[in-house]
Amino acid sequence: MQKIILAYNFTPERLQALKLICMMLRTQLRAVAREELLQPVGYLAGLPEVASVSEAYSGDEGQEEMLLMCGFSRQDLDRLLAAVKKGKLRQVALKAMLTPTNCTWSGLQLLRELSQEHAYMHGKNADK
């Protein structure tokens, strides 16, 4: 699998900063459009075994920025996170690696899961 980052819900300014990081790391970047939120993340990453869906997303849910790293080694991930921290982006709260488990999930499903995990890890869970 080729190295690619899927970027969800980035403003044009923050997307430009991410593009610079990707150029420096020689990594492909794909900005995912809102209407593609229902597409399986594996399909968007170019996995031939994951099929697309015909439905386009038109809702308001899932506004948070999210990065999905595909085909990354641990060293690649460390370099990306260091570049984000040192650069204009500073941080992106929701991040994940493409896995055999999440490759069939939609971007919206992954956003929901990561948002819940992030809230729990930062003590924002009402069920505590």
Task: Give the positions of each predicted feature.
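N-terminal, charge-rich interaction modules
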Residues: 1-47
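Helix-rich interaction surfaces within compact, conserved domain-sized segments
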Residues: 3, 16-24, 30, 77, ...
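Short, charged/polar micro-motifs that form catalytic or ligand-binding hotspots
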Residues: 8, 66, 70-71, 96-100
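Short beta-alpha junction loops
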Residues: 11, 35-37, 73, 99-103
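Short, intrinsically disordered low-complexity segments
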Residues: 37-68
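Noncatalytic linker/hinge segments flanking ATPase motor cores
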Residues: 45-51, 70-75, 106-115
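Mid-chain, well-packed structural core segment of small domains
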Residues: 57-87
